[in-house]
Amino acid sequence: MLLVLLLCTCVRAQIAERPTSGELHAGIQKLQVLGSALYMAAHPDDENTRLIAYLANVDKAETAYLSLTRGDGGQNLIAPDIRELLGLTRTQELLAARRIDGGTQFFSRANDFGYSKHPDETFNI
């Protein structure tokens, strides 16, 4: 019984971050706006971060970016063994960008297979 009591007092739950007064004020202002925007693009480096930041912070719209791929295709000159790591790196970059610009990040399951010069090349991949 004593062991259970000691375990219960030692276990700590994750402490929630307390928002600053500025973050609370921005959140209240955002509640007064009825609007949302979804920015869609094929690759992680195709987004317009200035537009996302403007819509999220100035217009106070619920703003999100949908990247259809994670950018693991890269350029055809990049070695195939780096593809997955490149996708992971670009994913983390997008998540960090959304923490800065105030948007929400979404991904689809589309596979990035690199550049194609001709439609036949695309369908063969």
What are these model-derived regions, one by one?
Residues M1-R12:
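Bacterial N-terminal signal peptides
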Residues Q14-I125:
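Active-site rim/loop-helix segments in enzyme catalytic domains that contact anionic ligands
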